[in-house]
């Protein structure tokens, strides 16, 4: 599939989106020998970058340019600041916000996700976020937040998932007192169990971040600028800087308007094909076998499979799902979580090792002699050996307890 018979015209592949999945696809397509006129359309004014590192840009650890991702340049063309507003799947054309039309032979949707903004009273003023309130999804968001943080006295982060914890840690590093309001009983509940969540909370407290789990924000206070966050119980947290970190929702508007099958995300099969001929979807916007991953690892895997198929390097390549690893790198608060980590799972045994002095916590979930899930918090010395065993479904040694110890895992 590396060439298309269209007379002298080159095959045209359009990629809507210029984030991690899009950049990875373009790079792998070209490195695999793919031949096409490959164009990426990015609504943001910047080249592709790694959103996972936004908190480190906020603290000043990295310059924005340092998190830029390769996208196969110069073989691929990247059109920044170019929003696609409509897709004609029958005519195989895109309509751009500037009125221009662009034809394609094959289309890859890598539109990513939008931040979820909860229905908080006082969140908007004149159709914009109230002054002092911020989302945290893009480099532009990061720049605005950094500018506001210089003048701020107290910050509240609404949402205690991965993004919220990252933002809180970064704001604390800038010298701000920070409070997290989180509706769930403990932090990062999608990846961590209660014990790990509590250990993470203690680590944040040591950095100057307080946490209010099991609480819901219902309103922002302030006249023209945020002065506080009102909780559902009526208590008000003083703040002149608020970060909304309530997760993300697949960006499916273009696909839906074009008539593609959409549930939570754009529905794709094992070939990453959508319901429209010649149209594919990868990354945060894609729903495969009922799952929207929303993680970097699966996005890369999907991009690699689609690049192999469309380049002709492996036309039979299939994406059958991921065994994703969720990871947060935040100094002493770093963690990794994978697989099934819930309690009372049928047919499983659980091994735990906690060190309150070091603030570390490890948990392995076993089914027979196989590792089916794990949590590592504060000490990732064993993460390589354990994730390899999980991803490969390798049998574990007869006494797996030593795998919780760095030296034991290294010898395995």
Regions found by a protein language model. Give the residues of each.
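Cofactor-binding loop segments of dinucleotide-utilizing enzymes, especially the Rossmann-like FAD-
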Residues: 18, 41-43, 111, 160, ...
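A Rossmann-like FAD-binding core segment of flavoenzymes
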Residues: 35-39, 77-96, 102, 174-270
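FAD-site-proximal beta/loop scaffold in flavoenzymes
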Residues: 128-150, 224-230, 235-305
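Mid-to-C-terminal Rossmann-like scaffold of FAD/NAD(P)H-dependent oxidoreductases
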Residues: 8-12, 285-382
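Beta1-alpha1 glycine-rich phosphate/pyrophosphate-binding loop at the start
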Residues: 2-78, 168-191, 385
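Glycine-rich Rossmann-fold phosphate-binding loop(s) that bind the pyrophosphate
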Residues: 17-20, 137, 158-163
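FAD-binding core/adjacent interface of flavoenzyme oxidoreductases
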Residues: 1-10, 69, 73-154, 230-232, ...
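C-terminal auxiliary extensions adjacent to catalytic cores
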Residues: 2, 355-412
């Amino acid at each position: 599939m590396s060439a298309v018979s269209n007379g002298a015209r080159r095959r045209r592949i359009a990629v809507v989106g210029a984030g991690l999945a899009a950049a990875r696809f373009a790079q792998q397509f070209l490195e695999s020998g793919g031949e096409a006129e490959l164009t990426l359309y990015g609504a943001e004014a910047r080249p592709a970058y790694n959103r996972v590192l936004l908190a480190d840009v906020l603290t000043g650890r990295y310059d924005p340019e340092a998190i830029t991702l390769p996208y196969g340049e110069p073989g691929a063309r990247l059109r920044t600041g170019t929003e696609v507003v409509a897709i004609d799947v029958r005519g195989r054309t895109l309509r751009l916000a500037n009125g221009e039309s662009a034809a394609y032979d094959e289309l890859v949707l890598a539109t990513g996700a939008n931040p979820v903004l909860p229905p908080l009273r006082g969140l908007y003023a004149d159709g914009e976020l109230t002054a002092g309130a911020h989302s945290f999804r893009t480099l532009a968001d990061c720049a605005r937040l950094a500018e506001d943080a210089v003048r701020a006295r107290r910050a509240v982060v609404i949402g205690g998932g991965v993004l919220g914890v990252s933002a809180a840690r970064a704001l604390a590093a800038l010298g701000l007192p920070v409070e997290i309001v989180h509706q769930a009983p403990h932090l990062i509940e999608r990846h961590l169990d209660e014990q790990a969540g509590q250990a993470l909370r203690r680590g944040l407290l040591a950095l100057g971040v307080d946490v209010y789990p099991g609480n819901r924000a219902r309103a922002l206070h302030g006249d023209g600028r945020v002065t506080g966050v009102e909780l559902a119980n009526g208590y008000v947290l003083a703040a002149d800087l608020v970060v909304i970190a309530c997760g993300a929702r697949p960006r499916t508007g273009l696909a839906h308007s074009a008539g593609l099958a959409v549930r939570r995300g754009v529905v794709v099969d094992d070939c990453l094909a959508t319901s429209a001929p010649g149209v594919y979807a990868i990354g945060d916007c894609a729903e495969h076998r009922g799952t929207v991953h929303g993680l970097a690892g699966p996005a890369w895997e999907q991009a690699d499979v689609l690049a192999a198929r469309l380049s002709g390097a492996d036309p039979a390549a299939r994406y059958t799902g991921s065994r994703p690893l969720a990871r947060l790198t935040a100094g002493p608060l770093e963690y990794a979580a994978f697989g099934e980590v819930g309690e009372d799972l049928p047919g499983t045994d659980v091994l735990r090792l906690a060190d309150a002095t070091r603030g570390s916590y490890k948990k392995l979930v076993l089914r027979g002699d196989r590792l089916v899930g794990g949590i590592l918090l504060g000490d990732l010395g064993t993460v390589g050996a354990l994730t390899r065993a999980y991803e490969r479904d390798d049998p574990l040694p007869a006494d797996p307890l030593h795998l919780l110890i760095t030296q034991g895992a290294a010898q395995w």
